[in-house]
Design a protein with these regions (language model features):
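Phosphate-recognition beta-domain surfaces
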Residues: 1-23, 27-145
Length: 145
């Protein structure tokens, strides 16, 4: 939980690196409950670059609990992005991302529908509350399948 362990990307990397089946649940500053799940391993590596991971089985998804909608992966090559300088990132667009110190910056950018899409139109305002958003809190769980 970021409000306990910290919002820094270092804390996300420390707690989640090399773990798979991660479920991320986020409360935006606009009161939207959104999140994502991926069975892939979050491997950050030792380099300072962004690494996209391919979900060949197309099991990753993002969701909105506020809207009760699930957005399946449509671009397998952009399932998740791992970076030592970011929190969790879903999609190449980025469909859902949590940046370093996400509680103090509007640099959390959303482009829902790029790599994850349910076939219906949705605006950034509907999903995140706005195209750029603060993160009030987020939690990461490892799902045991």
């Amino acid at each position: 939980k970021a409000s306990i362990h910290g919002f820094s990307s270092e804390k996300f990397v420390e707690n989640c690196s090399n773990k798979n089946n991660l479920l991320v649940i986020c409360l935006t500053g606009h009161g939207k409950l959104i999140g994502g799940f991926s069975p892939l391993k979050w491997s950050m590596g030792n380099v300072e670059k962004n690494i996209y991971h391919n979900d060949y089985e197309m099991k990753s998804f993002v969701f909105s609990l506020t809207l009760n909608r699930k957005f399946p992966l449509v671009k397998s090559e952009f399932a998740i992005m791992c970076s030592r300088n970011m929190g969790p990132v879903f999609g190449g667009g980025s469909d859902f991302e949590i940046v370093d110190n996400a509680d103090n910056t509007l640099n959390n950018y959303g482009n829902i529908g790029d790599s994850y899409h349910d076939g219906n139109d949705i605006s950034e305002k509907e999903f995140y509350g706005d195209e750029k958003y603060l993160v009030k809190d987020y939690e990461v769980y490892q799902v045991m399948l």
